[in-house]
């Protein structure tokens, strides 16, 4: 895998801090990707060209981030045969709820997989799982990644909890301090 398999696109370069965790996880898994800015509103022709041509260049999955009206993921999905994963970006007024609803409420026939507001890491992981259909080594790496997640230690245990605080956890999770 050397040619980009995932296209990470955003409506503005100010979206990069939101998108960057997707790039980091793709890099961690060794998945080649490209990054670009294409706006559904400011550069619609460029956006449509990107969406229509991505598959001819070997891109397998497109991850699109947008805030506000967040038309980018849906418009790209309408113009490409590839799977599209939308990342809603939080802006100051509605904290990303407008973006989430805009991306998630697609008409029948124009699917966009949507992650949580600002959920770029999950978008990257979903892209990797999607690629796993074709690249079995990614399935193996994902299984290792999930196994390593079992080593996660909740941050609440070091804190002092009141003895009255109910803890709903199986005994295998450890004991309360």
UniProtKB/Swiss-Prot annotation:
Q: EC number(s) of the enzyme?
A: 5.4.99.18
Report any one BP term from Gene Ontology.
'de novo' IMP biosynthetic process
- Enzyme superclass (EC): isomerase
**Coiled-coil intervals, chain numbering:** none
* UniProt GO molecular function: 5-(carboxyamino)imidazole ribonucleotide mutase activity
Instruction: Report which reactions are catalysed by this protein.
Output: 5-carboxyamino-1-(5-phospho-D-ribosyl)imidazole + H(+) = 5-amino-1-(5-phospho-D-ribosyl)imidazole-4-carboxylate
NCBIfam families (alphabetical):
purE
Query: Which family does the record claim for this protein?
Result: Belongs to the AIR carboxylase family. Class I subfamily.
The job of this chain, per UniProt, is described as:
Catalyzes the conversion of N5-carboxyaminoimidazole ribonucleotide (N5-CAIR) to 4-carboxy-5-aminoimidazole ribonucleotide (CAIR).
| Protein name per the record | N5-carboxyaminoimidazole ribonucleotide mutase
Originating organism: Corynebacterium ammoniagenes (Brevibacterium ammoniagenes)
């Amino acid at each position: 895998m050397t040619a980009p398999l995932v296209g990470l696109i955003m409506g503005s370069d100010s979206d990069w801090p939101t998108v960057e965790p997707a790039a980091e996880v793709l890099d961690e898994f060794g998945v080649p990707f490209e990054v670009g800015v294409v706006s559904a509103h400011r550069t619609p022709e460029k956006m449509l060209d990107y969406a229509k041509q991505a598959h001819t260049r070997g891109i397998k999955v497109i991850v699109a981030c947008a805030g506000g009206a967040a038309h980018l993921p849906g418009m790209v999905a309408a113009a490409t045969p590839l799977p599209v994963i939308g990342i809603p970006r939080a802006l100051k007024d509605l904290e990303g709820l407008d973006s989430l609803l805009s991306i998630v409420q697609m008409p029948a026939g124009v699917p966009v997989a949507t992650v949580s507001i600002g959920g770029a890491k999950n978008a990257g992981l979903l892209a990797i799982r999607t690629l796993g259909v074709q690249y079995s080594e990614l399935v193996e790496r994902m299984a290792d990644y999930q196994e390593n997640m079992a080593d996660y230690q909740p941050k609440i245990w070091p804190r002092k909890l009141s003895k009255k605080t109910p803890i709903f956890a199986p005994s295998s999770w450890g004991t309360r301090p």
